[in-house]
Amino acid sequence: MKIFQIQCSSFKESRWQKSKCDNCLKFHIDINNNSKTSNTDTDFDANTNINSNINSNINSNININNSGNNNKNSNNIEITENIDNKAKIINKHIKTITNSKPIPIPIPTPTPISIKEKEKEKEKEKEKEKEKEKEKEKEMKSTINLRSEDTTSNKSTIVFTECLEYKGHQWRPNICVTCFSPKNKHKNVLPETSTPLISQSSQTSTITPSSSSTSTSTSSISTHKTANNKTVITYISSTTTTTTTSSSSSSPPSSSIAGITNPTSRSSSPILKSVPPSAYSNVVIPINNINNSNSNSSSGGGNNNNKSISTPSSPIISRPITNKINNNNNNNQPQLHYNQPQSSSVSTTSSPIIRPVLRRQFQSFPSNPKISKAILEQCNIINNNSNSNNSNNKDPVILCKYTIESQPKSNISVLKPTLVEFINQPDSKDDESSVKSPPLPVESQPIFNSKQSATMDGITTHKSVSITISTSTSPSSTTTTTSTTTSIIAEEPSSPILPTASPSSSSSSIITTATASTIPMSPSLPSIPFHEFETMESSTTTTLLSENNGGGGGSSCNDNSRRNSLNILPLRLKSFSFSAPQSDSMIEQPEDDPFFDFEDLSDDDDSNDNDDEELKEINGEKIIQQNDLTPTTTITSTTTILQSPTLEKTLSTTTTTTIPSPSTNSRSICNTLMDSTDSINNTNTNTNTNTNTNTNTNTNTNTNTNTNANINNKVSTTTTTTTTKRRSLKMDQFKEKEDEWDQGVDLTSFLKRKPTLQRDFSYCNNKVMEISSVKEEAKRLHGGTGYIHQFAFEAFKDILEAKQTQINRAFCSQKIDAPDCEMLINEINTAKKLLEDLLELNSNSSGSGNNSNDNSGSSSPSSSKTNTLNQQSICIKSEI
């Protein structure tokens, strides 16, 4: 079947396919009206057909163009040549005549396939699939029948639909491992009451228990002081006996089942044999040997055969355990008696069904800690009048008994952690002469015996034993742990049993026990016994107190010494400033004083002296020249204490002494007249100011005034204490780092504006501003006073040198360019020239001033020396 193509008026090359028209999306007809390619052909076929006809088409196109003038009524052919660089394909396009019509393309009629044939083919495919499934089911049934004949006699019809056998996942037991489908969709899952697929009838075992026991004993002692300066001794001894019973297997011929474990219980391994819990339900433990250490302790006619036992429930055991007391004194070791169900041997014919074990059922990691409280069970108060050597120390001794639940050491990984909490503390305000016992708990009331008491030197000791029995079972062994705890707390005065220091000083005593173990005691009460040591044999309380009474020469140590050694002492900085009496020569040359502009630090001018002389001549003897009465000596002591890097305390003391001039001695008349007007000649003022600039301001001022009838001197002392919060000095431009820019502004404000500033312009601009500020300050000083002091000139010069070093560093680190560096150095040089010019003006003015002063009879060198002597240097020293 041949498909005709439609001709279009103009050919437009497609972007993606060079041989296709973009208007009609088809391959066009050549000059000979032969179709090059069909619409179904690929671009490769079209290109090959076009390439084969290139030469013939070019020749025919040339002939048509030459004869185009003669045949005007014929078809006008427009040839467009598009040459591709890679394929070099030339596509010819024919322009149709305007009166011509497009050639219609006949639509082919496809030969339809009958629907019935398609349905038949589908049915055949389905039948083939069903046959394959049936073959697979037959194979699966054959394998299952073979297994069922070999393993079990009770055959059950099992049909498998998905996998051969169901295997539960370890973490998700309801999902099969092989097909990952739920358990409900499997038909091969056996019920729980039926026998397993793989039986172990041939492997039978009989458990014969074999026991082994270990015992450990620990004791601890601790003391603390109450509010009434009473010493409380806590003595806790713990004896732990662990009995482990393991099973050895044998294979008797009989296959009787005495006990079968619960199939619903999950086990981690199918090989281990499980033991019914009824076999270990009753545990009998003798108590006589456990309490042998306590039999010799009571000396007051007590009955030692009556022992008390308390069995609090263990948090590990889920089944109840019945405890019995065996008073047989012939048994030296703990014994275990088992109640055998129906037969003497316990055997299992098959292992339980393999079940996955969930993570939450493992006990390898301990759960949340369980708080076992130390319950106060008995408390007795004994008078201490017989042993008291001092009349002041007659405090009673309080004996308290606590019961603490202890955990065995063998199953630390299985048992829960235990925290001890002291409750029901004895009241220190009880009457000294009476003996009080608080109400006992319901569980521990039958534990105590009133006859278990002994008196020695006015002290009564009480003993009781608390036994905790815990049992943990496993498929192969059973561990029974018996923990015996004896706890005694005795409160006694600090003297004469325990030598302690005075109540005002905090000290810790040392107690020496029978095992030569030295324990430093802490004055504070801990929540858990903090000093714990193991002993060869548990010593009794009576022996402990007697040894402490006789040889308790304890030493004391000061806790504050170690604490103070760790503290960092504050840094003290002291500065002193001294001002000598001023002479008349200083007034003649005020230009040498750098603080001439300040009125409070300068004396009167010569014009004022002339006015005083005129007033003296007018008023006679009633007016005294002011310069003769104002020579003063001022000593300023400033102490700065840096208590912390952010806290600063300043203590300032100023002492001012006013001494009359010697010229006033010749004017005794004037002095006698002024005595009536002067009421206070000696004044001492102490001002203490505490200021905290952080949040609040507290000011405390204390002023002390003393009046003495002293005519010749006036002394005033002022002390000021100021506590301020230390801040930065904001002088970052003088301590520039190599990796940071020196912007010459406040660091905080610069960091806020840093992203918006340009790199080079900001640096150069700030440096120019700093140099110009030095120029302006120098001009201001010279314009106001007419001179610049030499110290100010040196300070300005040092600042300019520092700026020059900073600019050199910036140039070396490539922060600024060479022209910028030259520009900044030129600015510094202009500032230096300005300072030198101002200094020359100062020298000229000082030379003219010296000439005038020489004519008046005064010497400038002497005045300069007195000026340097009057302004003393500042001494700074640190004290730690």
UniProtKB/Swiss-Prot annotation:
Residues 193-223, 240-256, 294-332, 536-548, 844-864 have a biased composition (Low complexity). It comes from the Eukaryota. Residues 101-149, 191-224, 240-273, 294-350, 425-446, 470-508, 536-561, 580-613, 682-713, 844-880 are annotated as: Disordered. Residues 589-613 have a biased composition (Acidic residues). Keywords: Coiled coil. Residues 113-147 form a coiled coil. Residues 115-149 have a biased composition (Basic and acidic residues). The keyword Coiled coil applies. Residues 257-271, 333-342, 865-880 have a biased composition (Polar residues). This is Uncharacterized protein DDB_G0281025.
